[in-house]
Amino acid sequence: MASIEEIRQAPRADGPATILAIGTATPPNAIYQADYPDYYFRVTKSEHMTELKEKFRRMCDKSMIKKRYMYLTEEILKENPNLCEYMGSSLDTRQDMVVSEVPRLGKEAAVKAIKEWGQPKSKITHVIMCTTSGVDMPGADYQLTKLLGLRPSVRRFMLYQQGCFAGGTVLRLAKDLAENNKDARVLVVCSEITAICFRGPTEAALDSMVGQALFGDGAGALIVGSDPDLSIERPLFQMAWAGQTLLPDSDGAIDGHLREVGLTFHLLKDVPGIISKNITNALEDAFSPIGVSDWNNLFWIAHPGGPAILDQVEAKLGLKEEKLAATRNVLSDFGNMSSACVLFILDEMRKKSLRDGATTTGEGLDWGVLFGFGPSLTVETVVLHSVPLNC
């Protein structure tokens, strides 16, 4: 019989956790930002609020978003008018939607990642599922496992209600699992549906309207493992380090509360300032062991939040305009998809690097940073290392 010491000596991986495949998915319903103020005030029966509509139009114009995707269509909203009220009793209606749609959209992204990976799904050993869109038991991790037909013995982790920083959280967890379990292959899925937080406008809560102007639906999926078999697996990025921190003096900066009216968001105006004020410390903690101090020598994958956050971070660090190009492209094409955003940006980064003829998956650079920002304020930082591209 094995001793506890022998069990503890189970083999661990030799190399760093590596992203081996990426998949993304959105609902088919595209919403164009230029048309959204008219649409939003019409479907919520708020067209009489003319001054508020003009404020909302300015929010949309400043968002730097061209297009978003949403599960909610005009037909669905007509059938469920309680979603269109500002504080309508609606949690059951919202839950009925997201409990099925979150894993379904997650499956679409996962299928693409598994196809790119090219290995049998029976080799998946762990599943990390993440969403801020509703909550249920058994969870979306269970539903995803059933939808994909994964092994009953797959080890599952479910993250609910973490918010926008969680795209970094799932990478940190996947890193620990891959590096501490030899031959582990971790399926990571972030799936977000705004049906949980869509609501009509009110002058009394402009921060709620900011969310209505920014958020979109999407799901991202990764396959993560250490010591890839280079004859059948294609590394995209390695994860060298991952950490989480709470920013000082940020209590109440971003809050979300799940209530009978759905998920409500509240944010302070100085969120961009709080993040930009503290980002240098986060970077120094992560990169001083590597010897990187020029932040323009990194490739950047930053949760977009909104354009004000990106602008202030860019100014604070003296970043060249092109450093946040991948992040801004995703914000423009998809909006803020909460936890899924950074997975879309990873996908954009490796594809853009290939299109541009770069020598690595990180725009020709070796080292990069992935940032997730979210409630409390919490910051997730992941140090990435690119891999060579055979252009």
Swiss-Prot record:
Which catalytic residues are annotated? C164
Organism lineage string: Eukaryota, Viridiplantae, Streptophyta, Embryophyta, Tracheophyta
Q: Which domain of life is it from?
A: Eukaryota
Known catalysed reaction(s)? (E)-4-coumaroyl-CoA + 3 malonyl-CoA + 3 H(+) = 2',4,4',6'-tetrahydroxychalcone + 3 CO2 + 4 CoA
Q: Name one GO molecular function term.
A: naringenin-chalcone synthase activity
The entry's keywords: Acyltransferase, Flavonoid biosynthesis, Transferase
The record's listing under PANTHER family reads: CHALCONE SYNTHASE, HYDROXYMETHYLGLUTARYL-COA SYNTHASE
Record GO biological process: flavonoid biosynthetic process; polyketide biosynthetic process
Which InterPro entries does the UniProt record give?
Chalcone/stilbene_synt_C, Chalcone/stilbene_synt_N, Chalcone/stilbene_synthase_AS, Polyketide_synthase_type-III, Thiolase-like
Job description of the protein: The primary product of this enzyme is 4,2',4',6'-tetrahydroxychalcone (also termed naringenin-chalcone or chalcone) which can under specific conditions spontaneously isomerize into naringenin.
The text of the family note is: Belongs to the thiolase-like superfamily. Chalcone/stilbene synthases family.
Gene3D superfamilies, alphabetized: 3.40.47.10
- Which Pfam families has this protein been placed in? Chal_sti_synt_C, Chal_sti_synt_N
Q: Which PROSITE patterns does the record cross-reference, listed alphabetically?
A: CHALCONE_SYNTH
Q: What is its EC number?
A: 2.3.1.74
The protein, known as:
Chalcone synthase
Identify the metabolic or biological route this protein is part of: Secondary metabolite biosynthesis; flavonoid biosynthesis
